[in-house]
Amino acid sequence: MTDKIQCDYSALDHPAVLARIFHPGSGGVTGPARPNELLIPVDENVQIGACFHVEDKQAPTILFFHGNGEVVSHYDDLGPVYNQMGMNFFVVDYRGYGRSTGSPTVSHMMADCHTILDFVQNLLHKNGFTGSLGVMGRSLGSASAIELA
């Protein structure tokens, strides 16, 4: 077993860097939350928006960190595709994206992905999901996926 390496990402939290990294997507967030949408508490007064497309409690689940300029609702068409392939699909936003509160920073993104993973693992366990859990990221989301690897 290897020890987890702790990284300090605070140097990347400079406003000039953040302005180039994070571009919260617009659109796609209208009306009240749908039944498969959740808010994940990650910090005091900060919640991350998510959407859980469920196929089956025995199916594997993909925890998906989307790309920059996107929000959870942009994956409303892709979730059912994963379901048709026999997988559950759990897509999450970042601070300041979609229904999420707070402001995005690299440090927050990297810390939040650990809290999100814990939340998803607990949610699956409490609700009787028995399939495996995989993590996937696209573009900006690949950093969170690699952080959890």
For each predicted feature, which ranges?
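An N-terminal hydrophobic leader/cap segment in hydrolases
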Residues: 1-41, 48-51
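Short beta-strand element of the alpha/beta-hydrolase
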Residues: 59-67
